[in-house]
Curated annotation (Swiss-Prot):
It comes from the Bacteria. This is Large ribosomal subunit protein uL22. HAMAP family: Ribosomal_uL22_B (MF_01331_B). GO terms for molecular function: rRNA binding; structural constituent of ribosome. It comes from Herpetosiphon aurantiacus (strain ATCC 23779 / DSM 785 / 114-95).
Length: 113
């Protein structure tokens, strides 16, 4: 059985968030939260929040044991991009792209139906 949680429009580049997501993919939920607790990245607490939400969804909706859960899938997709301009010399302007991410976490207890 699987449970899912999604965080949308997280204001950080997907490229940077994927670096943290790759560290916890396939790990036990408690082990993944332990790893994220000590990472110095801005994305780590947000990914931990989504994993905790997926864990709570599994417990509440499907009565799955939280100790047996594994991070089966963690996807980081591109969200909307905010376009801003930075003034430059001689009246020019450069476009700045402020990227955002959608983080999807699927946890599984490994049980086959």
């Amino acid at each position: 059985m699987q449970a899912k949680a999604i965080l949308r429009n997280f204001r950080m580049s997907p490229q940077k968030v994927r670096l943290v997501a790759d560290l916890v993919r396939g790990k036990n939920v408690t082990e993944a939260l332990g790893i994220l607790q000590y990472l110095p990245h801005k994305a780590a607490p947000e990914i931990a929040r989504v994993i905790k939400s997926a864990k709570a969804n599994a417990d509440h909706n499907y009565q799955m044991s939280p100790e047996d859960l594994v991070v089966k899938t963690i996807m980081v997709d591109a969200g909307p991009v905010l376009k801003r301009y930075m003034p430059r010399a001689r009246g020019r302007g450069d476009r700045i792209l402020k990227r955002s991410s959608h983080i999807t976490v699927i946890v599984d207890d490994g049980e086959v139906l």
